[in-house]
Amino acid sequence: MRPASALVATVLALASAASAAPPVVHELFPAGGRRGTTVDAVFGGADLGGAVTVVGTFPGTVGIRRDAKPSASSLPVRFVVPPDARSGEYEVRVVTAAGVSAPRIFVVGDLPEVLETEPN
Protein backbone atom coordinates (compact mmCIF):
# COMPACT_ATOMS: atom_id res chain seq x y z
CA MET A 1 0.00 0.00 0.00
CA ARG A 2 1.36 3.43 -0.88
CA PRO A 3 2.06 5.79 2.05
CA ALA A 4 -0.65 8.21 0.89
CA SER A 5 -3.21 5.40 0.71
CA ALA A 6 -2.21 4.17 4.15
CA LEU A 7 -2.61 7.67 5.56
CA VAL A 8 -6.08 8.04 4.03
CA ALA A 9 -7.14 4.63 5.36
CA THR A 10 -5.88 5.50 8.85
CA VAL A 11 -7.67 8.86 8.88
CA LEU A 12 -10.93 7.26 7.73
CA ALA A 13 -10.67 4.52 10.37
CA LEU A 14 -10.04 7.06 13.13
CA ALA A 15 -12.88 9.28 11.93
CA SER A 16 -15.38 6.42 11.99
CA ALA A 17 -14.26 5.36 15.47
CA ALA A 18 -14.49 8.94 16.73
CA SER A 19 -17.99 9.35 15.30
CA ALA A 20 -19.38 6.36 17.20
CA ALA A 21 -21.78 7.73 19.81
CA PRO A 22 -21.63 6.60 23.43
CA PRO A 23 -24.73 4.83 24.77
CA VAL A 24 -27.66 6.92 25.96
CA VAL A 25 -30.08 5.36 28.45
CA HIS A 26 -33.52 6.97 28.79
CA GLU A 27 -35.14 4.33 30.98
CA LEU A 28 -34.72 1.12 32.92
CA PHE A 29 -37.83 -1.01 33.42
CA PRO A 30 -38.55 -2.38 35.88
CA ALA A 31 -36.22 -0.20 37.90
CA GLY A 32 -36.06 -2.35 41.01
CA GLY A 33 -36.31 -5.73 42.61
CA ARG A 34 -36.73 -7.60 45.85
CA ARG A 35 -33.79 -9.09 47.72
CA GLY A 36 -33.16 -12.71 46.80
CA THR A 37 -34.86 -12.50 43.39
CA THR A 38 -33.88 -12.44 39.74
CA VAL A 39 -35.25 -9.54 37.70
CA ASP A 40 -35.41 -9.38 33.91
CA ALA A 41 -35.29 -5.71 32.93
CA VAL A 42 -34.75 -3.61 29.81
CA PHE A 43 -32.63 -0.51 29.28
CA GLY A 44 -34.24 1.75 26.68
CA GLY A 45 -32.34 4.44 24.83
CA ALA A 46 -30.00 4.91 21.89
CA ASP A 47 -26.71 3.42 20.70
CA LEU A 48 -27.07 0.38 22.99
CA GLY A 49 -26.45 -2.20 20.26
CA GLY A 50 -22.77 -2.72 20.96
CA ALA A 51 -23.17 -3.15 24.71
CA VAL A 52 -20.26 -4.98 26.30
CA THR A 53 -21.34 -5.01 29.93
CA VAL A 54 -23.31 -3.22 32.65
CA VAL A 55 -21.38 -1.70 35.57
CA GLY A 56 -22.22 0.24 38.71
CA THR A 57 -22.70 0.05 42.44
CA PHE A 58 -25.28 -2.77 42.30
CA PRO A 59 -24.22 -5.48 44.81
CA GLY A 60 -25.35 -8.48 42.75
CA THR A 61 -24.68 -9.55 39.19
CA VAL A 62 -26.05 -7.98 36.02
CA GLY A 63 -25.83 -9.79 32.72
CA ILE A 64 -26.83 -8.85 29.20
CA ARG A 65 -29.51 -11.26 27.94
CA ARG A 66 -28.29 -12.20 24.46
CA ASP A 67 -31.27 -14.58 24.08
CA ALA A 68 -33.66 -11.60 24.15
CA LYS A 69 -32.09 -9.91 21.09
CA PRO A 70 -30.47 -6.63 22.12
CA SER A 71 -30.82 -3.75 19.65
CA ALA A 72 -29.64 -0.16 19.28
CA SER A 73 -32.64 1.07 21.30
CA SER A 74 -33.27 -1.81 23.71
CA LEU A 75 -30.91 -3.78 25.94
CA PRO A 76 -32.43 -6.69 27.90
CA VAL A 77 -30.56 -7.52 31.11
CA ARG A 78 -30.93 -9.81 34.10
CA PHE A 79 -30.31 -8.58 37.65
CA VAL A 80 -29.58 -11.23 40.29
CA VAL A 81 -30.27 -9.57 43.65
CA PRO A 82 -28.50 -11.30 46.56
CA PRO A 83 -30.67 -12.19 49.58
CA ASP A 84 -28.33 -10.21 51.83
CA ALA A 85 -28.23 -7.07 49.65
CA ARG A 86 -28.86 -3.84 51.50
CA SER A 87 -32.07 -2.05 50.60
CA GLY A 88 -31.46 1.15 48.69
CA GLU A 89 -30.68 2.79 45.37
CA TYR A 90 -27.80 1.63 43.17
CA GLU A 91 -26.35 3.19 40.02
CA VAL A 92 -26.01 1.09 36.87
CA ARG A 93 -24.44 2.13 33.54
CA VAL A 94 -24.25 0.55 30.09
CA VAL A 95 -20.76 0.17 28.60
CA THR A 96 -20.08 -0.01 24.85
CA ALA A 97 -16.89 0.34 22.82
CA ALA A 98 -17.84 4.01 22.27
CA GLY A 99 -18.24 4.91 25.94
CA VAL A 100 -20.31 4.65 29.10
CA SER A 101 -23.89 5.83 29.65
CA ALA A 102 -25.07 8.18 32.36
CA PRO A 103 -26.26 6.29 35.44
CA ARG A 104 -29.76 4.93 35.97
CA ILE A 105 -31.07 3.88 39.36
CA PHE A 106 -31.97 0.29 40.30
CA VAL A 107 -33.74 0.02 43.67
CA VAL A 108 -33.37 -2.99 45.96
CA GLY A 109 -36.06 -3.49 48.59
CA ASP A 110 -38.03 -5.96 50.68
CA LEU A 111 -41.35 -5.58 48.88
CA PRO A 112 -42.26 -7.36 45.65
CA GLU A 113 -42.17 -5.36 42.42
CA VAL A 114 -45.77 -5.05 41.22
CA LEU A 115 -46.31 -4.23 37.57
CA GLU A 116 -49.30 -2.05 36.78
CA THR A 117 -52.03 -3.52 34.61
CA GLU A 118 -54.20 -1.37 32.35
CA PRO A 119 -56.80 0.09 32.55
CA ASN A 120 -56.30 1.84 35.87
State each model region's role.
Residues 14, 19-21, 57-58:
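Short, structurally constrained coil/turn elements
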